A protein has these predicted regions:
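Intrinsically disordered, low-complexity coil/linker segments enriched for acidic/polar
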Residues: 81, 120-121, 259
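Juxtamembrane helix-entry segments on the extracytoplasmic side of multipass membrane proteins
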Residues: 120-123, 221
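Transmembrane helix interruption/hinge and helix-loop junction motifs
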Residues: 48-52, 120
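Charged, low-complexity, helix/coiled-coil-prone segments
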Residues: 5, 98-110, 206-208
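Interfacial aromatic "cap" segments that immediately flank transmembrane helices
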Residues: 13-45, 78-106, 134-186
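Juxtamembrane transition segments at transmembrane-helix termini in multipass membrane proteins
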Residues: 1-14, 19, 23, 53-77, ...
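Alpha-helical transmembrane segments
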Residues: 122-134
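Juxtamembrane "helix-exit" motif on the non-cytosolic side of transmembrane helices
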Residues: 109-118
């Protein structure tokens, strides 16, 4: 199904976090063809160069979702200025990714310091990791603001306060979405794990001096497992983006209702 002007889905509408995820999953599944139409260059690039390819894919997807926020429906055709907007959104997606990397580095460094320098190191390290993760959780809302709005990057820092005000919904939403993505990625890595285990056993047997007969189609199996992994990765990113866009719109709708009251 492709969204048209007769089938509007308003993004900025107050919804529960569970409703955002349910609607995000169904909308992402219904518009898989539209997403492919808008993002196929980055998908093909990711098969060869995963890192820049995935960033460009996220940028193209964010641009599509921003148009959905403005129009009320997911546009089937890409606008003429779409490539320029793709580059703009890819840069904002890269900024969002760098924020996540910075937060992970800070949490990891503090966890390591707690384990090394504090008594009961392992216990204190676990406590530090949990506490810092909960403190940093509102940053998720800030990264959504970076990806789905046109606000200048310094202004997007206010998204942290927005996430703090809606901390309960953000925590429940993040945990549920994390479990869904975990299931998707476990399914995607299953073929690759089988291929890796078989390759490791064959390599160990060869080192032990045994004669190992490698199937003729084995290289194709390795390539197929890699492609399957990328497909599931794209699926997880797409589901996350659709759900995040709806959750971001829902939070903004709640904020607008509070201001009116």
């Amino acid at each position: 199904m492709e969204t048209n002007t007769e089938n509007h889905i308003k993004v900025r509408e107050a919804r529960s976090y569970a409703r955002c995820i349910k609607l995000g999953l169904s909308t992402a599944a219904d518009h898989a063809g539209v997403v492919w139409t808008h993002t196929w260059p980055s998908v093909l690039l990711s098969l060869v160069l995963p890192f820049p390819g995935l960033i460009i894919f996220i940028g193209q997807l964010d641009r599509l979702l921003c148009e959905w926020s403005e129009l009320g429906f997911v546009p089937r055709r890409k606008p003429l200025e779409g490539w320029r907007m793709d580059a703009h959104r890819s840069m904002r997606a890269l900024v969002s990714l760098l924020v996540f990397v910075f937060i992970i580095c800070v949490i990891g460094s503090c966890t390591w310091a707690a384990m090394v320098y504090l008594p009961h190191g392992k216990l204190m390290a676990m406590a530090a990791m949990v506490i810092l993760t909960l403190v940093a959780l509102p940053s998720v809302m800030m990264t959504m603001e970076v990806e789905y709005s046109d606000s200048p990057l310094p202004v997007c820092r206010a998204g942290w306060l927005t996430g703090f005000r809606h901390y309960g919904s953000l925590l429940a939403y993040s945990l549920l979405l994390f479990m869904i993505n975990l299931l998707i990625m476990l399914a995607g890595t299953f073929p690759m794990n089988i291929v890796t285990m078989a390759s490791t056993q064959a390599w160990q047997a060869a080192l032990a001096g045994d004669t190992v007969m490698t199937p003729t189609m084995w290289p194709l199996a390795i390539i197929a497992s890699y492609i399957i992994f990328l497909i599931f990765t794209f699926s997880a990113i797409t589901v996350t983006a659709f759900c995040n866009n709806l959750f971001w719109g829902s939070i903004h709708a709640r904020e607008a209702e509070k201001k009116q009251d």
